[in-house]
Regions:
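All-alpha prenyltransferase/terpene-synthase fold signal
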Residues: 1-333
């Protein structure tokens, strides 16, 4: 799947979202504007607005409506992207990250204070897009959904920190963390997209189900790449375990080799004082099928995401959503 081809297919809708992002991030303050422009030029695949626009258009076509998308759909799509990047700017400070998507982070270039402030700016501009310019733009349900997502993002970070200290993450904890930190933002992107075109309850539910499963698959793939990726991923291998994060590949390896699970968890606890334990844990994961275990779970979520698309009528957008799910499993970045 070529993301550039999907953007081209989305045409004026994609351009409208990009224009909104550019205008929303303009401040008239040189340092802030230069930083924002640099971030936008390295903003990755922008999967959340891509997902949002595809869902909006799929809902319209499934309902047999020939109308085009309006600024409401564009605003929600752009807001999701701003919110996503705001969390990354804050995450880079919390994690002490020097690289993001293969380029230096704002934290590394300009310091943690600037990264936090820029993240705050992106967050506020996301809220502005959600609210709209006029009273008629205000949708209390959408505001509540984005608010719940913000809460989930914070809760996920805190739960991950708590579990990193205790090294007792289990599969249920892991799913909750990746729902809060990743899947919830996919979910709100898709659900507000459906709401923006007045989709039926059936299509809303299908959009939500697809997006949550896609989000799970996306994060599991990220966690797999942390153990088996290459330099093209944009970050060194083993970052998660060095930060004491027990993700699905490690959970899988411990499930496959339970007699060593207790010792491995103790090693995770001691990584701050024994950095060499990280390399030993990475080897343990590779030797005990942890990556393969996670890949099997990933494929289940991909299949479930594709299954959720059955509620939509046949259209190019539906096919692209299917391709997006398959692409998530195969990507190498």
């Amino acid at each position: 799947m070529e993301i550039s081809g999907v953007r081209e297919y989305l045409g004026d809708d994609w351009k409208a979202v990009q224009d909104l992002l550019g205008s929303a991030l303009h401040s008239g303050i040189e340092l802030l504007d230069t930083t924002n422009e640099n971030l936008l030029s390295h903003s990755g695949k922008q999967l959340r607005p891509l997902l949002s626009l595809l869902i909006s258009r799929a809902c319209l076509k499934s309902a047999g409506v020939s109308e085009k998308l309006t600024q409401v759909s564009w605003r929600y799509a752009a807001a999701a992207e701003l919110l996503h990047n705001a969390t990354l700017l804050h995450d880079d400070v919390a994690d002490g990250s020097d690289l993001r998507r293969g380029v230096p982070t704002v934290r590394a270039m300009l310091g943690p204070q600037v990264s936090v402030l820029v993240g705050d700016f992106w967050l506020v501009r996301a809220v502005s897009l959600i609210l709209g310019d006029n009273d008629s733009d205000y949708n209390p349900r959408v505001v509540k959904l984005f608010s719940q997502t913000l809460s989930s993002l914070a809760e996920g970070e805190m739960l991950q920190l708590q579990k990193a200290m205790s090294a007792d993450t289990d599969y249920g904890d892991y799913l909750r963390i990746i729902y809060c930190k990743t899947a919830s933002l996919f979910e709100v992107s898709a659900l507000t997209a459906a709401i923006s075109v007045f989709a039926s309850k059936q299509l809303e539910d299908a959009a939500r189900d697809y997006a949550v499963k896609l989000g799970y698959a996306f994060q599991i793939k990220d966690d797999i790449l942390d153990y088996s990726g290459t330099a093209s991923v944009g970050k060194p291998l083993g970052v998660d375990v060095r930060e004491q994060k027990i993700t699905l590949p490690l959970l899988g390896a411990m499930a496959n080799c339970p007699q060593k699970a207790g010792r491995v968890r103790e090693m995770v606890k001691k990584i701050p004082d024994h950095g060499e334990f990280a390399d030993e844990i990475i080897s343990f994961v590779k030797e005990n099928g942890g990556v393969e275990y996670a890949a099997e779970k990933l494929n289940v979520f991909v299949d479930e995401a594709i299954g959720a698309l059955d509620a939509f009528g046949d259209c190019r957008e539906k096919e692209l959503l299917k391709e997006l799910a398959l692409f998530t499993a195969k990507r190498t970045w």
